[in-house]
Amino acid sequence: MRLIIVSGRSGSGKSTALNVLEDNGFYCIDNLPAGLLPELAERALLHTELLHPQVAVSIDARNLPSQLKRFPELLEEVRARHIQCDVLYLDADDETLLKRFSETRRRHPLTNESRSLAEAIRDEELLLAAIIDHADLKIDTTHLNLYQLRDMLKLRLLNKPEPGTAFLIESFGFKRGMPVDADLVFDVRCLPNPYWKAELRDFSGLDQPVIDYLAAQPDVEEMFQDIHAYLNKWLPRFAASNRAYVTIAIGCTGGHHRSVYLAERLGLALKEPLKNLQVRHRDLA
């Protein structure tokens, strides 16, 4: 049995995550009381013919605070039964969550006469602290639309070709914010920028003219060799520590040229030693 626990602040995309998982064969349960997690695991062991082999449940701030505080011990009970269990935590910045609630006009579950929407959003993070601390995969949905979030969920949760740590190399542009869910961040803004070459500006790091330009720059090659040497040495150590997911972010100014080029090269260079490796370009249209 595979169990995915989906959590996150309201408006971060939990419903979308459950829909994606359901569309891909998971039996989904929304707003499961956290205290029922061990019972769900026990039933899975005793009645394997009755329960679906892939189950996803959402646990969020609608739970009793006392149950949320017990999440670490409840999770340990589940994993002690040797069930493959991943904890997914979705989030977005406060401003984005406020905007989403304003646009949909939905009521936040924690708002009341004495608590404003902004206060509810802040308080929700405190309530979910125990889940945040034990999340295997965190996804920041601030800059993701509905379709991008669906693609990201499929990429990270459903496309693991074999057991072990799932690695993601992600290019991004600092002008749209640094990905808060990254485990390692490399800033490559010091490298020559193709954007300032008029004939290269409209291309990306996936296009041959930009590839040829950057491949000819000594500083770019040196940066690639240094990052590759670091990742080649240390990523296997992450895998050996039983990490389920590791995200490596490569950032330039706009996320179109230098970071894309280096992410692609690193993906190719590390594909053989790291079987579960994927490359994504956050800011390419």
From Swiss-Prot:
InterPro entries: P-loop_NTPase (IPR027417), RapZ-like (IPR005337), RapZ-like_N (IPR053930), RapZ_C (IPR053931). GTP binds at residues 60-63. Belongs to the RapZ-like family. This is Nucleotide-binding protein PST_1028. One of its GO terms (molecular function) is GTP binding. Keywords: ATP-binding, GTP-binding, Nucleotide-binding. It holds the Pfam family RapZ-like_N. It comes from Stutzerimonas stutzeri (strain A1501). Displays ATPase and GTPase activities. Transmembrane segments: none annotated. ATP binds at residues 8-15.
